[in-house]
Amino acid sequence: MMPGRVGAINLPTAATLFDTAIGHCAIAWRGATVIRFQLPEASPAATLARIARRRAGHLDEEVREEKPTGVIAEAIAAIHAHLAGELDDLRWIPLDTGEIPQFHRAVYDVTRAVDPGHTLSYGQVADRVGAPGAAQAVGQALGRNPIPLIIPCHRVLAADHALHGFSAPGGIDTKQRLLAIERTSGFGEPTLF
């Protein structure tokens, strides 16, 4: 279960860049809760710029680069290890999802419950959030996921197990790489059953 707003709304937003096995990632947080995560862009500077950009409707938000401590430092260490193949479900990392629309939060809750090495289809996620037939809406919600990897949208596939669209930098190649790191089998090729 992901916590919503945890009293961090009035705290400043901090961010940092860190190197991983797949390149430089970035994380933004308020207090002890993660609010955004960024997979590697074309350069470390582009990754940091993306995580630091102001969100729509938050013109007063200033993101400052800081050295992480406490649970945020622990989260970075776990992400680093996960991307190096020491798998962690990352569910213990506290998130602030209070500003995310309710349907998206429901989709993210279901998605976050998928263990590394496993996948669901967009339709299965729709069924689990109580919206049968809403696979396209699930895909749209996952395309707007502000905290990829920690909310593992890469673990949601088309019904035929094919890798369709992935809005993170690197697109389908990044999705395929993350699934390979997690030793996920049966993706990328349609099955007969």
Label each residue range with its predicted role.
Residues M1-P132, I181-F193:
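Basic nucleic-acid-binding alpha-helical/helix-turn surface characteristic of O6-alkylguanine DNA
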Residues G133-R177:
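Short glycine/serine-rich loop segments
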